Amino acid sequence: MPHEYPWTMAFYHVESMAPSMRQLARTLLLRKKTHKIKSNKDINQQQEVLDSNDPAPTHNFTFRDTDHFKSLIERLPPEITFVNISLDEENVLWMTRCHSSIEPVIIRLSKLERDDPMLAKMSEILESSDLSVRKSMNIPQESDEKNENGESKILDNEIERDKEHLHIKLPEKKSTEQDLQKAKAFWGERKRLDEQLKVFIGDLQHKWLGAAAPLLLPPAVDLQDNERVVTRLMGLGVFSIPTLTLLLQLYHYISENEWIRLSKLLRDNETQSNRDIAHTTMSRIAQIIKQGSIKSSRKCYTLLVVPPQLSHLPWECLPIFEQSPYVMRLPSFHIFEYLCTLEQEIKELPKMVNGRKSFYVLNPSGDLSNTQKRITDFVGQFNWPGLVGEVPTRDQIRLALTESELFLYIGHGSGGRYWRSTVRETYCNAVSILMGCSSIKIYDEGPGFDGRSSLYEYLIARCPCVVGCLWMVTDGEIDSFQHNTGQETQNNIKTESIKLFTEAIVKARLSCKLPYLTGASVVAYGLPVAAAMDALLKLNV
């Protein structure tokens, strides 16, 4: 039973994640250290490298034992909740929830079928989306403005992303009635797929997570502010102290019916008793929490780990996350601990980013003219150095990643075709925003493997945060998302000293024309980060 040895069970579930990626990290970091030693001809300098306390080369990406793992969880800031979703060799889905205030909760969620209908449905939606994008050559962009019939206008000066992607040059011409009908059909199909994805996400939560869905959320209360409530609840003797604490922490997020379902799930998880808890008892517990608890006002985060074969699913858009939408992904908890170690024991999160120390690469292939036009207007608000329409050299990329605090790429894919192995050879200081189709998609290679992704190279290079796309979207849509994210980061500049990147992403997602098909494709891996607002905008001095 998971409740009998919670720390041991949690240790094994968490330790099982991303073994191949962690081995790659060990190999690359050792290679960096070896290269650093060989490049220093001075014997004393070589010995200094060997004796260095730099955690990067010596980090082994594993936990020594259960006690080591427990000590790391207990050192987490209270605003951080770590949730590990794992898939065992029998295709059973498990959730492991860890927080510094209580012992872990391990829940057996569901057994996935060999050809699971949910995964099949997601593949169907993405295949239809890809097909609609590829067929959309020379389709004008839809405007937010309405015509006299209440329908969206079609913009003549917008062109379709795949025409640019395939390097096809078509003569400029005014849209004909046939073109406008094609555009109407195209955007009708995109909106239909967006609605399908919305329904799918709700079904995903219901069928795979069920009553356990609230466990994805961080605490809504601070325990030190609610000690009297905990004491009163302990006197009832219905639940264990960890379970009572968890029920208190999540009460303010969910309806009473959802809370009762969660209570029963947790009780079944910690006892083999088939006796139901009296409804009056549950109502009394709920009343004590409702009347006596104090809800916290601070922003909290969920660090979410999912296996590679499930990484293409839009977990961040599950309905339950509407209550606390700040979600950061990780390949494994080891990567979070590695990034924190490299930041010399981060005392507070989010990590602050100086927006004035930025660099961008825009349309290096030179074939995304409309994207270049749109984004040039956007970056023109800032005093950022960058490259437009030209391929950066490896030295330029290396300097951008090491000396800047924000790196923005807008082009095809992740940009890896241009700088190859440069990222893995660098110690990356810059939060990296990769706005290209499938830029941080993890390509599944089967059970027991961690897949392939440019994402891994950035995280191994100690990139604090990587933002990118999980699947294909049109250039116009993702350009709009990038613009909305920038606008959200600037909002309330007179009243807020910092702005969460994750908060800006959430709001940009909601303001998308296609909040699921486009908005849900953008996710963030790594540490929570925030921009210093007074440093982000160009100063007129």
Annotate each predicted stretch with a short phrase:
Residues L303-V305, E405-I410, V431-M435, V466-G468:
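Structural motif
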Residues S421-E425, P447-E457, H483:
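Charged helix-capping and loop-helix junction motifs
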Residues P2-K347, V353-Y360, T371-N383:
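Domain-scale, conserved, charged regions that form catalytic cores
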Residues K351-V353, T422-N429, A461:
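Short, conserved loop/helix-junction motifs that constitute active-site signature segments
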Residues Y360-E425:
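Functional beta-strand-loop-alpha-helix junction segments that form "active/interaction loops"
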Residues P464-E477:
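Short acidic/histidine-rich active-site segments
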Residues R417-V423, G476, S480-V541:
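Caspase-like cysteine protease fold
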Residues Q309-L313, P364-N370, H412-R417, S438-I442, ...:
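Short acidic, S/G/P-rich loop/turn micro-motifs used as interaction or catalytic elements
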